[in-house]
């Protein structure tokens, strides 16, 4: 991997230097510079211009033409991105980073009248474009090199919940960096049919997903149905042949109407568990399989008519009771893959601090048995699920308590209550941990459990304990995915990592 990164850096440097040796023709000062991409003019409100010997072009028209997007991180810092690639840049600075690898620009981006302009030569190199100048025509001709980062052999699935829109964390902010599937959460169920979960945000999000897919045809978007709050109707939906058919037909209609590539079924949970108000039945075990089979048949029928492949994954609970209450061997033969919710093994419903997403159980702590990703994966494999259909869950949030005892640096101690979170008590988005500088700062010390392969934070002054995921623990989970031959990783949920720290690590680790 280090040799590969060195090769990337060297290639970029050689390419930039080679381009710099080509003279920049001044052109006719009275004539307008034109920029084309694969022979087509790039139209912009502000014409390209030269400054300090460099030609500049308005950013958005250029990026739209070549299939990239821009996201502002603050007043001067921004990111250019497409699936599998991201370039970090800053106005007035020549430093840049391509997929985390240091790069350098000869000329810096500039901001004029609140509009971003990019130096054509330097940026085109990072975008993977060839640059040709025609002095006679005063034209910059950009062409695609045909090179594109090799896709990961693993599924990288990211849930995006509708409520992230209310926090101004739009889909486009997270759709780069190697995500292969976006699960929009959640659609609801009314009168036995799939309906929008939140009309106020869903229409805009669905339109944005379509735009993202146009920019990256390899990206797939699925609608996730149900979830923790909206699983109450599932038992009734799965009860009879008529109710199953009605649901399946509505799901296919929803997928077609809104341009999705399939349905992610998130029933929490068959037979028992979930909200206390949920209706469950012993027959849910068999009916769940029948519901999946009916939905698969209807999606396959639509696939033959539409010529589009429609996917059917499910979200699965991590507990042994979930395996006991389902027919996972039969379900696995129907679905495309299984998103394992390998997190929330411990949390706000308990009064003792513990890891909520351990990779391995600790034999020295009996209460950790059955509460690790490895335990869950082992249970599903034992139930007859092929490893390639299991996608390991990775949380982008932490759980926290306060008033926890100091023994063991706060781990496995009695606590007085839940820690204060940015959005709810006891919940800590990774992005907010970074924002508040709690990771090894502001009174918190980071500790590492070398058995469970996860970190935690502890503040001795307040007794606050936070269990969370970080780049180191993600590396171990990515290695586990590879070693076990699993199908990839699934993130709950991508907006909680609004700086992209964890997502970048995950996608790099699964290459």
Q: What do these predicted ranges mean?
A:
Residues 161-178, 239-256, 320-331, 373-377, ...:
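Short, acidic/polar
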Residues 182, 223, 265, 295, ...:
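Conserved, mostly hydrophobic/aromatic
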Residues 439-511:
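Extracellular low-complexity, Gly/Ser/Thr-rich intrinsically disordered linkers
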Residues 152-154, 178, 217-221, 259-261, ...:
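Short, well-ordered coil/turn segments that N-cap beta-strands
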Residues 145-255, 353-356, 414, 420, ...:
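Glycan-recognition patch characteristic of GH18 chitinases/ENGases
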Residues 160-162, 186, 223-227, 267-269, ...:
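A cross-domain feature marking catalytic cores of carbohydrate-active enzymes
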